[in-house]
Amino acid sequence: MNPDNTIAVITETIPIGMQFDKVYLSTFNMWREILSNTTKTLDISSFYWSLSDEVGTNFGTIILNKIVQLPKRGVRVRVAVNKSNKPLKDVERLQMAGVEVRYIDITNILGGVLHTKFWISDNTHIYLGSANMDWRSLTQVKELGIAIFNNRNLAADLTQIFEVYWYLGVNNLPYNWKNFYPSYYNTDHPLSINVSGVPHSVFIASAPQQLCTMERTNDLTALLSCIRNASKFVYVSVMNFIPIIYSKAGNILFWPYIEDELRRAAIDRQVSVKLLISCWQRSSFIMRNFLRSIAMLKSKNINIEVKLFIVPDADPPIPYSRVNHAKYMVTDKTAYIGTSNWTGNYFTDTCGASINITPDDGLGLRQQLEDIFMRDWNSKYSYELYDTSPTKRCRLLKNMKQCTNDIYCDEIQPEKEIPEYSLE
C-alpha cells in the first residue's frame, strides 16, 4: 500500500460537562467509524470490558452491539483481554456471538496485568490510546488516543504485538523470542510515512522488556529517548507519576529512570519541563511528595513546572470516572502516545504499548498534541500543587472545608493508601 495515503487522527474523550474552546474527534465517533468500515478482521487488545452503559448515553452499548454484529458479516474478531477473577458479561456476550477470546494471565506470567489498549482493523487501520473498553471511556473519563488509517506496514507491526498476547493466551513465556513475531520497525529504523503530505518517522514500542520480541523497542527505552532528544521542551500528561515499583510482598522500591531523565533535561540542557498529572479521589498520596520534590527544582535556570488536572464531578457521582486518564508526552520534536501510567510496574511487569511519531517539519500531529496539552494546562481544570480545590475531587489538594488559612494543610487523618493496581 502506498504510504502516501496514510491518514492519522488524534482522538479524545471530553467528559460530559467539561468545556473547551477546541476539541478533537471523539473516541466514540472514531471507534464507530472503524467498526462501520471493518470488513475482514478486527483484533482488540484490552484490559477489561464494561461497555454496557449504566447511566447517561448509550455510547458504550452502541459500540458493543457493533462489535457483536461483526461475525455475522463474516468478520473474524479476536479479543485478547486480561484474565480477571471477575466475570465479564460483555466478553461472554462476545463469545456467544462468535468472537474469539483469549484471557491473558499476565499476573501469573509476570506479576502485572494486560493493560494495553489498541485495535487493528482489516490489517490496515489501527487505534491506540488510553481508552478502555468501558462506557465511561466514551463519556465520563478524559481519554486521548490516535487512529492511523491506510497503512498496512504499521498495522502489521502492531499485529506482531497482538500475536504475542494471543500466544500467551495458550502458552507459557518462551525461553526467548528469537523465532517469534519480530518487529519490523524500531527507534533505530522507524517507518517512514507521509501524513497530509508531510514525512513522518513512526515506530511502535512495547512493554515490558520480557515480551519484546526481536528488534522491538522497549517502551521505557522509547520514552527515555523521546526526553533525551528534546531540545526545547518536554510536556507530559499522565494519570500517575510515581517513581516506585510495588513488590508482591507489599514493599516499595525506588525506580528513578523517568524522573532522572526529566531532571537531567531541565538541569543539564535547560529544557522546559511541564508535568500535568491527574488528580481525583483515588490518587495515591505518595505521588504528592514526588511531585513536590521535582517542582521544587524550579529556579532562574531550571524551568520545571507541575500542575494537577481535576475533572469536575458528575451529579450524581459515577464510580471510577471523572478523571484525566491520558498517557502521552510531546516534545519540540516528537509525539509519544501510550497506554501506560508512569509508575515503575507498568514498565517492568505490565503490558503496554506506545506510538512514537516524529514529523520532519516539527508540526502536524506533534503540533496538535502540543496544542491539546497547552489547552489543558491553561484551562480552569488545572491547579498548582499548593492551590485550594473547590471540591473534594482531588485527594492531593486541600479543599475549602479542610483549611481556613493560606497555609497548606494536609489531612489530619489521611485516608488509607490505595494500592497501585486498583487504579486503571
Curated annotation (Swiss-Prot):
Induction or repression: Expressed in the intermediate phase of the viral replicative cycle.
Keywords: Endonuclease, Hydrolase, Nuclease, Repeat, Virion
Domain PLD phosphodiesterase as annotated: residue spans: 110-137, 320-346
Places the protein is found: Virion
Physiological role: DNA nicking enzyme that cleaves extruded cruciform DNA at its tip. Probably nicks viral hairpins.
Principal location class: virion
Top-rank lineage group of the source organism: Viruses
InterPro entries: Diverse_PLD-related (IPR050874), PLDc_3 (IPR032803), PLipase_D/transphosphatidylase (IPR001736)
Name of the protein in its database record: Virion nicking-joining enzyme
Gene3D superfamilies attached to this UniProt entry: Endonuclease Chain A
Family to which the UniProt record says this protein belongs: Belongs to the orthopoxvirus OPG042 family.
